[in-house]
Amino acid sequence: IYMEVIIIKIPIQSTKKDVKNFLNELMTILNSQNFNEDNDLIIIRSTKDDIQFSTRYLMLDLDYDTSDIVERLKELTLAEYSETLIDKDDSNPPLLFVFGKSIDNKLVYIKLKIKGNTSKKILCLSFHYARHNMNFPYK
């Protein structure tokens, strides 16, 4: 018997307040004097699908390094929020915040979470050209 497993991502819409709280926490970490982009920002660069929708491809295409990604993350706004996903692989914390940002007239899909209680780290699971249209509930 052949069975196909389909992984269903269930997006939820966080409240404006929750998105603002996430962005405030993100900015606090990024703008902290103690922030070290090599230790406090984890960028997942693995390529699962098409190479042109990978973080590595975008970084090469735009000649970006980690500090460029940090600068773009510092610019994120409520209007760029798209959705919230549940992280099936890591439930600590379970929420992944998804943003869409226009960079060089291309839409970039950004998926983030903040980990840790005392020493917080930013986990950037996606920073690549958007594969699909994105919705922006607070635009």
Positions of the model-derived regions?
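Functional cores of ribonucleases/endoribonucleases
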Residues: 74-121
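Compact soluble domain cores
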Residues: 5-17, 21-93
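Enriched for short, Lys/Arg-rich terminal
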Residues: 114-139
